[in-house]
Every structure is written in C-alpha cells, then in structure tokens.
C-alpha cells in the first residue's frame, strides 16, 4: 500500500501561533478529538508579522505549527471521502493589520493514526524529549505489510506532526484543484519538502 505526505509548504500566508482561547498547542498534535472543548464560534489566527509580504491565501495555509489549516473546500472533500479521520475546528484568518481576510477556514485536526513506518529500515533520529517520536528523517521506509483497510488520512505513528494520505484521498484533493498543497511519496522520503 502506498501513501503520500501531505505538504502544505507554499509561498502564501504563513501562520506561526496557535489560536488563543482554545486547547493548548501541543494538544493539536495528538490524535484526539477537540471539538467538545473548542469554542463554538471558532477562534482567530493571524498571519505571521515576521513575513509581511506573504499575504496570498491558498486552500492549504502554510504554518510552522505542524497543524493543517485548510479552506472549506478541503473540508468538504475530506468529510465526503473519509469523515471519521479528521474533525474541522473553525478559524477566522486575519492579516498583518488584524483585518479579517477569511471566515471559512479550519484547523484540520487529524484524529486517525496508523503504524506504517518501518523504524528498523528507516534512517531517522528519534526525539530526545518524546522518545517514540522521530525528530529527523534522512530516509523514511514504510512497512511492507500494511493492511489496505484503515484510515485514508492519518498521522503516521512516530511522526505525529505530519499527515499522510492514501491514493484515493490524494486523487480527490488533486481532482478538486485545491491550492497550496503537494504530495510527496512517503516511502523513501528524505525529510525535505522540495
């Protein structure tokens, strides 16, 4: 079974802070539902003041936070195809002057996780703080016996800040012509986005 890494690194607006008033930042990196404790009216996230020229808004918004911020178009595709794999927490996006630029964006909180990484064959460095999490990838190898059933969009165990998709999700997102995203083959990935 093949999987791809969902890569939202692009030249558009960049977010560099978790929304205030919601769950603590680290909780967005754990495969758990947060909607019950998330404010019903949503939260606000702002463009990074460190990158004032980055103003373009794509369907996938670049972030240094290891979370996915996506448009309603992305939400619709994912909820139609694999509704149990993620929940969508509403955010209003504001620009560098704190003016609202979009109200139809969401934190795509990936609930599903899968054990797909072959740690023995991969060339990785494990985190000193989170002992079961990979901190650096030189060459990622996936297990050869991954069952075909299971989540289609998920956090790979040991790489919790990343999102992987199966070919059906990749095809659906590509067919929808969503912007600001690319897909990198997970098997053999060298840890770089380019």
Q: What are these language model-derived features?
A:
Residues 1-194:
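Phosphate/anion-contacting hairpin/loop surfaces
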